[in-house]
Amino acid sequence: MSSKKELLWQSRFSLPFDRDALLFSSSVHVDKKLYREDIQGSIAHVTMLAEEHIVSAEDATQIIAGLREIEVELTDGTLLPHWEDEDIHTVIENRLKEKVGAVAGKLHSGRSRNDQVATDTRLYMRRQITELQEALGGLLKVLVEKAESHRETIIFGYTHLQRAQPISAGHYYLAWFNMFLRDRQRLIDLMKRVNISPLGAAAFAGSTLPLNAERTAVLLGFDDLFSNSIDAVSDRDIVIEFISDCSMIMMHLSRFAEDLILWSSYEFGYLEISDAFATGSSIMPQKKNADIAELVRGKTGRVYGNLMAMLTIMKGLPLSYNRDMQEDKQPLFDSAETTIGSVAIFTKLLEHTKLKEERLAKLTAEDLSLATEIAEYLVRRQIPFRDAHRITGKIVTWSIASNVTLPNIPVEKFREFCEVIDPDIYDSLKADVSVNSKRTHGSCSFDSVALQIEKARKEL
């Protein structure tokens, strides 16, 4: 069965396009999200056409008025795209023809679907990058506030998911701050490559019409315009780079979510997630599940999948444009929406978490994570570090076997392992002393964390 509507390119063919083929190739259900960007680009294009006397000012005025009406109709739902329209660009052009008649056909002068779509994509990405930067800014602000509130709260630092050394909780939050700050910086850098106008490249070789690509670039707020018309329409590297940036953001969120999930469990008990961001069980009444954190962790896989999809779509495509590129929209849209949504909800979740400070103080006071302090104490007594490490390992083994915590080992026992140990070793076996004894740049001491907070605030 053939399709009923005549498509914009149909005149070349002797047979109507097969209905099932149209259904298979239609993208309007996905790219309808671009209607604002498409209308924005069309208004800029026809404005330039009038200024260059390619169309009359009167025709341009009619077209612009019609486009603005269509934007309202698409926004309020009075105009509903149909799959037989092939894509959102066709929806808009057909509706414009209904409104202003044959003059609508002048809109596409000097423009191909190729540079039209490339322009829409860049306009969409520009908006989404800005929104994602703002969402990250909110998360960074909460992290600084958490760091400031818990600058002197002692928690465990981990390696290999094993308690390693006591640290300031503020130091922990600032570690995440720096990761998400780099994520935002990557987006800022990406914007330099996204905010370049491809409009005027036409299909890929340019146009014989006296188009003013510089003018449309200015009208659309682009910082620059394309250098090569083939490149302008035939690559989607910026989409791949954006989804890669989203993947890194989601990776950081997923790792952070994992900590929150573990720390809020009964086995750890370091942190309380607000009831407003937890769910229960349909059968087990006692359960309090960190579902929001788990969903953020789970959605990371979707964004990773989108990145692999885009790399695979573009692999092996000959220059210049190929219809395969139509498949870039779903990974792009889903990655943007998933990442922005995940950052926003995770920020609220984190803001309402509470560290169980009393429990943490008790646990960190007498834990084996103070062992490194013994080794460094011995180094300060001129014991070579490798020997100090070996001696401390034996002390830890005895401590575990004897069920005696490090701060409670008698000095006489310490001296059985190394005779240079004096009673002043107990000064090092306190969690707060351990934290504040750190002297190196960017370390976890309270003073160092205060400096890091001051620096972080300048980035907000």
From Swiss-Prot:
Its main location: cytoplasm. Pathway: Amino-acid biosynthesis; L-arginine biosynthesis; L-arginine from L-ornithine and carbamoyl phosphate: step 3/3. Its EC number is 4.3.2.1. InterPro entries: Arg_succ_lyase_C, Argininosuccinate_lyase, Fumarase/histidase_N, Fumarate_lyase_CS, Fumarate_lyase_fam, Fumarate_lyase_N, L-Aspartase-like. It comes from the Bacteria. It catalyses: 2-(N(omega)-L-arginino)succinate = fumarate + L-arginine. It is found in: Cytoplasm. Keywords: Amino-acid biosynthesis, Arginine biosynthesis, Cytoplasm, Lyase. GO terms for cellular component: cytosol. The keyword Disulfide bond does not apply. One of its GO terms (molecular function) is argininosuccinate lyase activity. SUPFAM superfamilies: L-aspartase-like. One of its GO terms (biological process) is L-arginine biosynthetic process. NCBIfam families: argH. Belongs to the lyase 1 family. Argininosuccinate lyase subfamily. HAMAP family: Arg_succ_lyase. This is Argininosuccinate lyase.
